Amino acid sequence: MIKFENVSKIYPNGTKGLTDVNLQINQGEFVAIIGTSGAGKSTLIRCVNGLNDITSGSLIVNDTEVSKLKGKELRKFRRHVGMIFQSYNLVPRVTVLKNVMFARVPDMSLFKVIFGLFSKEDKLVALDSLNKVGILDKAYIRADQLSGGQQQRVSLARALSQESEILLADEPVSALDPVTAKEVMDDFKRINEEFNKTILLNIHHVELALEYASRIIAVKKGKIVYDGPSQEVTKEILDEVYRKEA
């Protein structure tokens, strides 16, 4: 479970990223965050795994107060929260399989990390994750030989190999063509339904958010202006979310 209680985030330059956010996201939900650029979507997601510190309030993830975590404790916590970025963050000249196994590095000794000594279990988990996103046949191909959609699937497989219950995604399909974007969203939906993973993603494509997510959270100027079922999002709500104020 993810629980925001009166969470605010103010950046060092005085910009308000979030203001008095109150949310509860239960295990197994598929939630899409929508809003204009700079509305606070990425800030909200990045607070969940501690990439952004909160300024005030309380943020609890699976009974852990995230804002109190530092150093080793924060790194340990992040192992259980998968993160998928828009830019894939893959090592280009390394195989797909090894890119996925890199998610297991935090549990390895320094010696094993230096020499790339992954265990049989690490390999099996990585192969299973690749199978779940439909690219097992690409396991021994270099990452830079894949299409954008395939690379994003590798990122998703890497997050799955952490064996986390929560998957965060920061604009995961914004760089993809419409057909490939739907294929990647299909993967998210299937993983959500088959494995009861909590999916929390921010997305510019409103039509995809409404089609795939069961719940929509709309952010405007760091505040939650809508939180409810996707089927109840009206044109009037979207007009309010995306209307530019003079």
From Swiss-Prot:
Signal sequence region: none
Reaction catalysed by this enzyme: phosphonate(out) + ATP + H2O = phosphonate(in) + ADP + phosphate + H(+)
Domain (ABC transporter): residue spans on this chain: 2-246
Keywords of the record: ATP-binding, Cell membrane, Membrane, Nucleotide-binding, Phosphonate transport, Translocase, Transport
GO terms of molecular function: ABC-type phosphonate transporter activity; ATP binding; ATP hydrolysis activity
Subcellular location: Cell membrane
Residues the entry annotates as binding ATP: G35, T36, S37, G38, A39, G40, K41, S42
Cellular component, GO annotation: plasma membrane
CDD domains (UniProt xref): ABC_PhnC_transporter
Annotated EC: 7.3.2.2
SMART domains, per the entry: AAA
Regions crossing the membrane: none
Family annotation (InterPro entries): AAA+_ATPase (IPR003593), ABC_transporter-like_ATP-bd (IPR003439), ABC_transporter-like_CS (IPR017871), ABC_transpr_PhnC (IPR012693), MetN_ABC_transporter-like (IPR050086), P-loop_NTPase (IPR027417)
Membrane topology: Peripheral membrane protein
Transmembrane recorded as keyword: no
Gene3D superfamilies documented for this protein: P-loop containing nucleotide triphosphate hydrolases
Keyword NAD carried by entry: no
Function according to Swiss-Prot or TrEMBL: Part of the ABC transporter complex PhnCDE involved in phosphonates import. Responsible for energy coupling to the transport system.
Subunit architecture: The complex is composed of two ATP-binding proteins (PhnC), two transmembrane proteins (PhnE) and a solute-binding protein (PhnD).
Family in the record: Belongs to the ABC transporter superfamily. Phosphonates importer (TC 3.A.1.9.1) family.
Protein name: Phosphonates import ATP-binding protein PhnC
Name of the gene encoding the protein in the UniProt record: phnC
